[in-house]
Structure formats: C-alpha cells, structure tokens
Amino acid sequence: RKYDLKALKSPYVTELMEKLQENNIKICVCSNSEKARVINCLEELELTSYVTGVYGGTDCGHTKPDPFIYIQAMKDNNISPDETIVIEDSTAGIKAGVASGAYVIAYKDSYDIADQHEANVIVNNFIEAEKYIFSK
C-alpha cells in the first residue's frame, strides 16, 4: 500500500522524536507492514537513531487490530500499558492500542478518514501530540 508509514513523513516527527529521546522516552514503531519495510523507511527518513524497537505485524503473525504487536513491544522494553502512549492514524491501529491498555493518541491526517472515536484524544499534528505526551 502506498500510504503505509505515511505518519513517519509528517511534519514535526523528527523534532518530536528528538525531544522524546532527550527525555529518555523509548520509541518503538509498530506497523502492519513488514519489519524490513519499516526499517527501510526509517533509514530513508534518517530516524533510526531515535527508535528502540521496530515491530512488523506481518513478521510476527499478528496484525492490527490484534493488540499483540503493542503488547510485545511493551514486554520487550519492560514497560507497562499505563506507561505506554500509542500514536496511531488507522482504525485498526487505534483498536489495537486501546486493547493493549495503552493511552492512545489518534493522529488525524489528510489522506484517510479513519474512525478514531475510540482513541483517548485526537490530534491534528505532532505538535499537539507532544503536548499530550508530556502532560501525561
């Protein structure tokens, strides 16, 4: 799909990742895409240095809305659901994040009209997302 990983290309993603890293907040990318595709995208966008873990749904055998990918990332990083914030732009991803027990921020983009009502909060950009992350 040509829209896969589009959120990584959004304005202010790099700045947000820098700030999270400066504050010792772990960043994992959990995608329904293949892990290799996610890694290639991160490399292309020069974001790999910010990321603690990459999880591909097609590689682990569980795709969103199954929460497995988020639960596995939490387990691997020794983080509980109440310490986890998921930023998602898809309906399936939001459902997975909610089912994992994480706090879910829905990112509203111009490409997709996803059903985002299950998220804890909906933001229009990553500057807004940052405010919720650091207020939680």
Residue ranges of model-derived segments:
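Short, acidic loop-to-helix structural element flanking the phosphoryl-transfer center
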Residues: 1-29, 35, 39
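Asp-based, Mg2+/Mn2+-dependent phosphohydrolase catalytic module
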Residues: 18-21, 35-136
